[in-house]
Amino acid sequence: MKRFAAVTLAALMLLTVFASAASAADSVEIRGPVFNGSNIVEIVGDGITIDATQFAAFYYDIDDNVTTETLSIKDVSGNSGNVIGEGGIVYSTKIQKVDYEYYKPSLGWDNYSLLGFFAEKYIPLKSNSADKLAKLVIDSDDKITLRTGETLDIGQGYTLQAKQVDVDGEKVWLEFDRDGEYVDDEIIEVGADDSTWDVELDDIQDEDDVTVMRVHVNQVFQGAVDSIAQIEGIWLIDYANAMTIESDDEFGDLDDVSINGDTLNITNEDTFTLTRDSTNELAEGLSFKVADTSSNVLRFYLAKEFTDPGTYEVRGSVASGEASWDASNFAGFYYDLDDNVETESLSVSELNGNVIGEGGLVYTTSIKKVDYDYENEDAGWDQYPIIGFFAEEYIPLKANSADKLAKLVLDSDDKITLRTGETFDLGEGYSIQAKQVDVDGEKVWLEFDKDGEYVDDEIIEVGSNSDNTWDVELDDIEDEDDVVVLKVHVNQVFRGAVDSIAQIEGIWLIDYANAMTIESDDEFGDLDDVSIQGDTLKISNEDTFTLTRDSDEDIGEGMYFKVADTPTSELRYYPAIERIVGNETTSITKPDESGNETVSDNETMPDNTSSETPDLNETDTPEEPTTTPEEPTDNETEPDESNGSPGFGVVLGLAGLLGVVYLVRRNN
């Protein structure tokens, strides 16, 4: 028992050290086209306009070729240098009709009014007026099965419960709730011509008879044990958070509002400065990201940062025939704004109807040099080679050869403080630990680990005669030796109120454990003709590639073409990748037991052992990454140690409890 308790206690304490490692991506940035010139007057010319075909964050329906939003920079008298004059920025959006995902016109599921509003989907409470809006929560044609008593989490606190399922009478009794409170219920006859339930509510921003939810019940049937209702078609708006836009409202720096029927225009009453080396907030999450350049160069792009959990599509510009994309018109490709560096391109030629001929689909990428985020040439932090590879950042193991690559894990100039014994999670299972901090001797002993296993360690001298940088070099990485896999710059060591502390400023890391060698006979999806010429990698299709209508056609490594549901003569498509924020987990809650039921788009009849259903729409809040507490400096904030990773306190509690058990058993 003593040995068991001691080993268990040690294991639990080890868990507490790495409890901060579990985290999910907490945001995704989608950018628009890059504008580059000497000043705003040169860039704007007679005026520039960005719409959804250029900016993937704006709403776009590829099937119907529908856009609603534009952002323009006008040629106004106040434009000068890096300053946009009064009224020079115009955001405009207009209500449009779009098809339901569950498209059944004969059942009343044809189209509805939608308005993009600062790159989010909103529904006008009145179909021809843009002043009263509610966010669209879900528009889905997924097939979902509910047993009697089960509750479906739709998103944003809204749920749907199957109160009773009457198979013989072909009826289902559904209840609609918000935050656990009753909203409405209905008995739906499934054998009727229209088995749709429209939930209409009054007094939504002073509007009555507002349709807030639509549910179509496809069928009811008897399962192996339970009576089951199958839903196909759900549409819901967040009516509880609907809003009315007034002419005196302000949205960030856009504060001159004009509402004209189905159109909303908002401009800037004051000048707007594109401050270099910064993100200039415009309104509602829209911003201009501006490069760190000299005063005679101005370079920027429009961006939207999404933080709500979910899967986001990052798309390129829309094409209707032969086309090409690079980082300027496909936000998925790697781009360094400060250095104006891009590496990737994709081209389509030899297009006959909707078929790309052999060798007509070509992906190319080349190695380029970019600055470290921590810029310090004297300490060896100047530039490093990088290559975009299917919209991910990779590092070549040899600076001029594109055949051996490792993914870039981290390139950061954030200030991090480590006390003696503390471990900092770098990502992908890598970590560094401050073994000892010697303030008097101006030294720090760091250890580098992978998945908790020792890799290397070093005593770093922090004195003025040292570059304060630890380069971790490893051998036999894809048969290459002396590969720099980690760079760490220690800024200073100092004594805090209690502990000796090391401050790190500058970390760079590659995922060497998953490095790869690309061979000429490799295949990447439908790209299977590989050519490596020094620092350039070119991959094309040996066979024809069909742009099948109404589909996502995989190109390779997560990149795909989304093709509109149109005749071949009206071909419309774009390249895209997906980025995931948070942890997507919508659930069906069972009445008497835990567990969920799995239902795919191709419905399989569930049995009594089914356990999981995929979520319709994300509602859970993602876990925030937990970093090591830092000693406050001018640019640092001491984190609240009470807000650790979920479960951290539980682990400590279990460790303490087992410690008591161990001591009691030892004394006995």
UniProtKB/Swiss-Prot annotation:
InterPro entries: PGF_CTERM, S_layer-rel_Mac
Cystine connections: none
Glycosylation sites: 36, 65, 111, 265, 583, 596, 602, 608, 617, 635
Record field: compositional bias (Polar residues): 596-611
A GO cellular component annotation in the UniProt record: extracellular region
GO biological process terms held by the UniProt record: cell wall organization
Residues in the signal sequence: 1-24
Biased composition (Acidic residues): 631-641
Pfam families named among the record's database cross-references: PGF-CTERM (PF18204), S-layer (PF07752)
Entry comment on modification after translation: Glycosylated.
Keyword Lyase: no
Keyword Phosphoprotein set for record: no
Compartments, as annotated in UniProt: Secreted, Cell wall, S-layer; Cell membrane
Main location: secreted
Region feature Disordered, mapped onto this chain: 584-650
Gene3D superfamilies: 2.60.40.4190, 2.60.98.40
Keyword terms: Cell membrane, Cell wall, Cell wall biogenesis/degradation, Glycoprotein, Membrane, S-layer, Secreted, Signal, Transmembrane, Transmembrane helix
Transmembrane segments: 644-664
Top-level taxon: Archaea
Function: S-layer protein. The S-layer is a paracrystalline mono-layered assembly of proteins which coat the surface of the cell.
NCBIfam families: PGF_CTERM, S_layer_rel_Mac
Name the UniProt record assigns to this protein: Major S-layer protein
